[in-house]
Amino acid sequence: MTALSSENCSFQYQLRQTNQPLDVNYLLFLIILGKILLNILTLGMRRKNTCQNFMEYFCISLAFVDLLLLVNISIILYFRDFVLLSIRFTKYHICLFTQIISFTYGFLHYPVFLTACIDYCLNFSKTTKLSFKCQKLFYFFTVILIWISVLAYVLGDPAIYQSLKAQNAYSRHCPFYVSIQSYWLSFFMVMILFVAFITCWEEVTTLVQAIRITSYMNETILYFPFSSHSSYTVRSKKIFLSKLIVCFLSTWLPFVLLQVIIVLLKVQIPAYIEMNIPWLYFVNSFLIATVYWFNCHKLNLKDIGLPLDPFVNWKCCFIPLTIPNLEQIEKPISIMIC
């Protein structure tokens, strides 16, 4: 009886060990599916006609790669064991593909951040004058080049290759890469926001108390009740910075608090989850605000061509709007997207 009981326990342990990767695979499927739904929701909430910048093209490419990963996982989960182009695919390839994607996503933060920053600087200075079609092709091939370069680096790095090779097909665990780039990028942005807020916290407090949320031209805006400038150049950099902070936090405050928690607690999030479209749009708004700040002396309000933000309406946040009969405009509403 004892021997039989031991054999049963051994069999149950082996069965549990065999089914473990399958449970992880279904969990990965649900996570990627949830991420894709978040991508669709975020892309649907953005302002339209804002596709003429690098970050927009990269966000669309990221959504496509996530969808491609979900399709691969679904096919492998459905067929479980099949041969394609003389290559045998099993459910253990789900972990392998997701690990490769995690490494790729993890190394994309710095290149995307720097490329988007250069793109906004060039567009703001108007040093590049490309036609609409040429600009679309340029962004398209730039995004493709970044993806291919990072993927080639991941597949060609010996340390990454050994890490992937060490995870054999029957491993009970499927560890994923946690990007150090995203942590330091979050730390960098949170510290800059903190220093900027401390520098002009009095102006920010005054603006928040005097600000009005109203509807203008079928759009909900922030209205700053200040007198119009005698010239068409923004002079007070401190007041301008406070308006940028108010506009930024009016949209991204929950995300800023989330980044503070991640930085302080050093939360380890797998790279295939951490690289997402809401995060990219958050970085995008931060970059636009930074470009405005460093070029505030060039902001000509008569002939202004501001980068379009899918979520933050920067123009109505710092340009002195002359709105006649403000009292007759619709009453302020509680839900607002700046």
From Swiss-Prot:
Q: Which UniProt keywords apply?
A: Cell membrane, G-protein coupled receptor, Glycoprotein, Membrane, Receptor, Transducer, Transmembrane, Transmembrane helix
Location in the cell: Cell membrane
Q: Which residue spans belong to the Extracellular compartment?
A: 1-23, 80-93, 158-177, 266-268
Report how it sits in the membrane.
Answer: Multi-pass membrane protein
GO cellular-component term (any): plasma membrane
| Function (record text) | Orphan receptor.
Protein name in UniProt: Probable G-protein coupled receptor 160
Gene responsible for this protein: GPR160
